[in-house]
Each structure stands twice: as C-alpha cells, then as structure tokens.
Design a protein with these regions (language model features):
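N-terminal alpha-helical transmembrane segments of multi-pass membrane transport
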Residues: 1-89, 99-106, 117, 443-477
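Membrane-interface loop-to-helix entry segments
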Residues: 36, 44-60, 166, 187-193, ...
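Helix-loop-helix module between adjacent transmembrane segments
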Residues: 40-45, 116-141, 150-215, 369-380, ...
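Transmembrane helix-loop junctions in multi-pass membrane proteins
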Residues: 47-52, 91-95, 177-190, 213-225, ...
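Flexible loop linkers connecting adjacent transmembrane helices
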Residues: 50-75, 97, 103-106, 119-161, ...
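Alpha-helical membrane segments and immediately flanking helix-loop junctions
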Residues: 69-101, 127-130, 137-153, 169-172, ...
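Selective recognition of specific alpha-helical transmembrane segments in multi-pass small-molecule
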Residues: 116-124, 204-219, 230-250, 283-286, ...
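Extracellular/periplasmic helix-exit of transmembrane alpha-helices
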Residues: 124-136, 242-258, 272, 302-305, ...
Length: 477
C-alpha cells in the first residue's frame, strides 16, 4: 500500500506530465518539476536583470568577507558546504547519462539551466540570510526554507506560531530526501570500489560508515573536514580534465561544434531527437546544481556576512562551479573519447572506459577515488543541512540531532550492501516535494531578495562615486 503510494507520487513528480509534439514526429516530455523550475529560473533571471552574468565579479568578491564570530561560518565556508552536496554522483554518472541519451547538445542546455538556476539560488539563499536565527546547539546561525516559510505565514497571521504546516512538510521532505540520498551514495561508492579494486562491498561499507560516524558525531567536525576535502577533490578533477583537454587539444573545435550543432541541429529536430537533447541537458543541469530545491539555503543561512546579498551571490557562484565547471569536466572527458571505446556501455562503466582510454589504469582508479570523495562529501553536506530542519521540527536538543545522524549512518550502511529502489524513490519524492514547497514560497517572498539586491547595488554605486570624487579632489590639490 505504502510502496504503491510512493510510486504514484514519484511518477507524478518525475514522470512526463505533458508532452509537446515536435516536427519529425517526436515529442518533448516535461515533468512537473521541470515545469516549476524553468519558469522560476527565468522569472528571477529577469527580475535580477541577468545577475549571473552582470554580477559575476561580485560573486567572487563575496567570498572575501571576514567573520567576527569564530563559531559562525564565512561565506566561503558555506560555499564549501553547498558545493559538497551539489558536486556528487550526478556530476559524474548523471552527466554521462545525459550525453548518452541526449548527445553532445545536452551539454549546452545544461549550461543554460546553470545561468537561470544561479538566479534562483541567489534569491533562496538571500531569503535564508534575511530569516536566519542564532543556533544555540552548534553556535553561529541556522535557517533555510523551513524558517523563511514559517516567518512568512507568521507575519501574515500576525500571531506567533510554534510550527507552520508548510514549513513542517518542507522539513520532513528534506529529512526523507537526505536519508534516501545516503543509500544512493554508499551503493555507488561500494560498487565503484568493487569494480576498480575488487574490494568486497561489505569491507568498503564498514570503512565508509566508520569514518563518517567519527566525523558527523562530533560537534563541528563536518565543516572542518569539508574545508579540506572539497577544494582538493574539485581542483584535482579540474586539473586532470585540463590535462586531458590539452592532450586532445586538436579535438576541441570539433567537440564544441558538436555541442552547439546538436543543441540546435535541424537533424535532431527532424529525427524527433531534439526533445531528448533538450530535456536531458535541462534535467541534468537542474538536478545537479539543486537550485530551487531549498537545500543550499540551509548552508547559506549559516554564513556571517555584512549583507544578505553576499550569501546569495556566493550560492549563485556555487551553481556555476557545479554545472559550468565540474559537469563540463565530465562532458569533456566523455566527448574526447572515441565512440568505439564507450559503445555499449552505460553509467559508471562508460565513464571508467573513457578514463581508461585517456589515462590507462590510473584513470579507472582516479574515477573510483573521485566518486568516493564526491559522494562522501555529499553525505557530510546533507547532514549539515539536516541540522536546521531537525531543530525546526523537534526543538533545540541533542537527542533528536543524534538520532537523525544515527539513522543516516544506518541508511549509509544498508545502501552499501544492497540497493533498495523503494528507498531511492522515497528520496526522490522528498526532493520533489521540497522543490514544490520552496518554489511556491519564492514567488511570494522573492521581492524581499530583489529589494536587498537593489540596496546593495545602490550602496556599491554610491561608494564608487565617493571614491571617484575623492580621487578628483586629490588631483585638484
């Protein structure tokens, strides 16, 4: 009964809700989440006046802010946490799947969704900063969609409330989602290590859970570990990709030509394949960078910064790093490998075959280790997100915090030794419901973030004019 219900909800959220016919007899199937996320991204890209493009330098500057409270997080540290959860298995296997089904053109649409997704990420992160509150358990600050949803309905009613039903549903959806993801993470890691090194899954699982337990059961060890692991894993993957690109530099014109030709190609439209190109790129871009799902705001709220806009700009940059940089790295690895090398393969096997072609056996080992680091950091990141949602539901007590961590560790163990698709579907349902609750409230509250952006821009303009005036006075003297 419950399994059947979950399957129906999963199909409603992730299945093709509508079909748009295309020339050549094909059609584009669009899911409910795509219907929600794409218009939301476009809407806020217009409202912010192309923020991801015109304010990219400000995104970089936002990382340099210093914190006064040693227990709080800097904007850079919150970027590390959100990048840890964004950059995961989807950046490897997900991109491979998108290209396998949608072709090289899917990469272009992945880039487009990153641009509009950055605008959504800015708005939700700025709102999280505006509605954050002190964290008496971990010190610093906490917040996220559950908190700004709560404040919205509390302000509307004019009465103090302990809980708001929509905020409660969001928090529960998040906790369900992150437990499901824990299973996917461990299953991917153990399978990868078994294929690459022949290590039995039970051994990898025990080590994975033991290391995770040592970190997550300590009060503030998660961020300290991520501060080290995330930059190393991202830089190593980027450097290896640059090496592969340089090694195959002669192929780059044809690779980019394929990306753009297949993104708009008449041949794809005529063959009815344009829908696959478009939707696979869009899906991979949206669900890799998490913009709109409400996950990253849980990290953004923890930042200590002099204006909420800086937290928003930081998370917009996170979308760029995830999709434009890391996902593109995987795409370049795939598109520079000969078709006969990867033919007939899928998923992780396909990516490992491409890496074996480029770097020999080292490539296979490197991908296995990279998947471990990407996935492990994702697990640590989602438990950081869970803190604020557990606190919203159960109050400020260590019992509930510890119980959820133990539950996540159990799911990590179970996922390492067996694959339960029901639990995976439950996790996907969780993130789908999170997205529905979050995008709905963004339309109602997004004006607050836009107002903060206008104030920020006016302040920067006034500061710039003041500096120019001072320089003019100095020249006159």
């Amino acid at each position: 009964m419950i399994v059947a219900l979950i399957e129906k909800v999963y199909s409603f959220l992730w299945g093709d809700l509508i079909h748009i016919p295309l020339p050549g007899g094909g059609s584009v199937g669009i899911s409910l989440l795509i219907i929600l996320l794409i218009p939301t991204g476009i809407y806020f890209t217009v409202r912010t006046r192309l923020l991801p493009i015109r304010m990219f330098p400000d995104m970089i500057k936002a990382l340099t802010g210093k914190k006064e409270n040693k227990d709080s997080l800097s904007t850079f540290q919150t970027l590390i946490v959100s990048t840890a959860t964004r950059v995961g298995m989807g950046n490897l296997v997900g991109v491979v799947a998108a290209i396998s089904v949608g072709g090289a053109g899917a990469v272009f649409w992945m880039w487009i969704t990153a641009i509009i997704g950055s605008s959504t990420a800015f708005v939700e992160a700025t709102l999280a900063q505006l509605h954050k509150e002190p964290d008496p358990l971990y010190s610093g600050y906490r917040g996220g969609p559950a908190y700004y949803i709560h404040h919205y309905f509390e302000d509307k009613s004019g009465k103090k409330k302990k809980h708001v039903i929509i905020a409660v549903l969001f928090a529960i959806s998040g906790l369900i989602c992150w437990c499901g993801i824990s299973q996917v993470i461990s299953n991917s890691v153990t399978s990868s290590f078994e294929n690459a090194f022949g290590v039995p899954t039970i051994y990898t699982t025990i080590i994975l859970v033991a290391v995770a337990a040592v970190i997550v059961l300590r009060k503030n060890a998660t961020v300290k570990v991520l501060d080290i692991v995330v930059p190393i894993m991202a830089v190593c993957y980027f450097v290896i990709t640059i090496f592969i690109i340089i090694k195959n530099i002669g192929m780059m014109p044809s690779v980019f030509s394929r990306i753009f030709e297949e993104a708009f190609g008449i041949r794809q439209v005529a063959a009815g394949g344009f829908g696959a190109v478009l939707m696979n790129g869009v899906k991979r871009g949206l669900f890799s960078n998490e913009a709109g799902s409400g996950s990253a705001p849980c990290a953004a709220a923890a930042a200590e910064c002099d204006t909420p806009v800086k937290a928003g700009l930081t998370q917009a940059l996170g979308v760029f790093i995830d999709t434009i940089v890391i996902c593109s790295c995987t795409a370049m690895i795939m598109l520079t490998a000969p078709e006969n090398i990867v033919a007939g393969k899928e998923g992780m096997d396909l990516l490992q075959s491409a890496m074996r072609y480029h770097l020999g056996d080292f490539g296979v080992i490197f991908i296995a280790v990279t998947l471990f680091l990407f996935s492990f950091s994702t697990f640590l990141g989602i438990l950081f997100y869970a803190r604020s949602n557990v606190a919203y539901l159960f109050g400020d007590n260590w019992i509930s915090q510890t119980m959820y961590k133990v539950l996540a560790l159990v799911m990590l163990f179970v996922g390492g030794i067996a694959a339960y698709t029901f639990v995976w579907d439950l996790g996907d349902v969780g993130i789908g419901l999170m997205t529905i609750f979050n995008t709905g409230i963004l339309y109602l509250m997004g004006g607050q973030a836009i107002k903060e952006l206008r104030v920020f821009e006016e302040s920067n303009k006034a500061q710039s004019n003041s500096q120019c005036s001072q320089q003019g006075d100095n020249v006159t003297q």
